[in-house]
């Protein structure tokens, strides 16, 4: 999930025309609150107070965004992840627990 979160943040400018540095995210293998209890979740948010309306744009384009993420991950020529596809200089967990191939498998299953 963490690799998908990073990749979505990287490609979000395709849909929003806003620099990916203005976007943040969190991912959880098992979220433990509310409606999503024990579900894997990814939250993407505006990095600026008040935001730019990214959530609505991303929600409306969620399937396209996930398809583009899968395409981007598959087309990256790296072996196991790189700064172009999943690594982020902004990562609060120092890019731990990133798995490019697991991200591809999850997206393929989700989109099938």
From Swiss-Prot:
InterPro entries: MZB (IPR018973)
Annotated protein name in UniProt: Uncharacterized protein MJ1572.1
């Amino acid at each position: 999930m963490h690799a998908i979160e990073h990749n979505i943040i990287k490609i979000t400018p395709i849909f929003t025309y806003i620099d990916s540095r203005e976007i943040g995210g969190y991912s959880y293998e098992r979220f433990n609150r509310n409606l999503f209890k024990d579900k894997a979740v990814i939250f993407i948010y505006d990095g600026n107070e008040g935001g730019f309306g990214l959530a609505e744009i991303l929600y409306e384009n969620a399937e396209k965004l996930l398809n583009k993420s899968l395409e981007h991950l598959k087309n990256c020529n790296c072996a196991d992840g790189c700064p172009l596809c999943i690594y982020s200089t902004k990562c609060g967990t120092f890019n731990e627990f990133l798995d490019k191939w697991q991200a591809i498998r999850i997206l393929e299953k989700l989109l099938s």
